[in-house]
Structure formats: C-alpha cells, structure tokens
Amino acid sequence: MTKPVPGTLQEGGAPFQTTHWTVVLQAGQVDADESARKALATFSETYWPPLYTFVRRRGYSPADAQDIVQGFFVHLFEHNTLTRADQEKGRLRTFLLGSLQNFLLKQRERMSAIKRGGNQQLVSFDLHLPETEAAMQATAHLDQVSCYDLTWASTIVKRSWQQLHQTLVAEGKAQWLDELKPFVAGVVAVPPNQEEVAARLGVPVATLRTWLSRLRQRYRELLRAEVATTVSDPADVNEELRYLHRVLMV
C-alpha cells in the first residue's frame, strides 16, 4: 500500500473545525430535517470503506458485508445510538468501530431485516468497491482492527488530497499539482528528479522547491482540518494525527 511522505500527518496549523459528530448527532434526532439526512448520507459515504473492510476481514462475503454496513448505518441513526455517544471522550474512528463490533454480536438476529438497510440506501458501494477490495487484499497480513485503522487513515489522506486537488484546479494549477503529487503524497517509492520536473514545467528548480514547500504546507493544513472533524476535543487532534501517521508507516 502506498505510504505518504513521513511527517505529513504530524504537522499543520489549520484551526479546529465543526466536527462530524455534530452532523451525525443532528441527523440522529427524531425531528431531523432533510438537510440533516443528506449530511448523514454524505457521512455514510465517507466512512463506509474502513467499516466494510473490517466486516470483510471477519469472513463475510462482499455482498453480506455491504448488507451489514448498510444496516449498521441505518441502525445507528434510527436507534439514536449517536445521541448516546460519549463525546467527551469521543473519537469517531474508535466509536464507529466499537459500535460496529457490538452490532455484529447480534448480526445473525438482524440479517433478515438489514438487507441493504431495508428500503434505505445510505451508501452506494459500486464506485469505490473495487479499490477497497484491492486495498484489503494488500493488507491481508494485518489483523482486523489494524486493517480497519489503515483503511480509516487512508480515507482521511484521500479526502485531504481531493480537497487540495479541487482547490488548485479552481486556481488553474492542476498541471503542476499532478507533477508535484509524488513529492508530497508519497505515491511512488522514489520521487522523480526535481530538475526533470522543473524542466517539464518550464520553471527554475528554485521555483519548483518553493512550490513544493507551499504545497506541503497546504496539504498538512488540510490533513489537520480533516482529522479535526473526527474528534470531539481539539486537544486530541495532534495525538490522532500521530496515531494515523504510525498506522500508515507500518
């Protein structure tokens, strides 16, 4: 599995943001409005890969794993499980895993009722299912929880990079972003030669290095901001960043 450049999950200065706890708690209320439900669907689409990976590693088939994850999300939101979460100690990563493990304990009793969440389709698996399956096969040497954590960390990194990409495309800088990605996100084992990349972009090497410095800083800020949405206490951001960095470096 591709590993990011060491340090990119350890630094950054973005301020703490509204957490995803807020989104899911609002969606879990009995009187939740349509906007809250849409936010809930977005939340489910974001975090299904690590949950799906964990269920698959428990020995379930792809079809059953999809049914279970779909049913799990419906169960969380329909039974107000999220409103009972202890946010004072809350990390979304560990809360969702613990809730899923509890859900699986009674899974057999629910199997007939949770087929793809009944009539509710919170998650669309088709688009990213092949890559999730491939990543799971590449981490067959890991235990279930480690595989979950690695998929979680990879999801955070992927979302951060997507946000960076969208921002720079809007600024008309998509070309040099594609050239510089190997230096920033560690998508190749050996980064390309800086002089060759500078020549392709038609800039001096010194300019390329300035761009790299700025790009890394923006990437770190986005990573930090993304992690901040998954913890209830801003003081936990640095520790969670360090933990995810260790997971990715295994």
Identify the residue ranges that each predicted region occupies.
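Intrinsic, short, N-terminal disordered tails of RNA polymerase sigma-factor systems
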Residues: 1-250
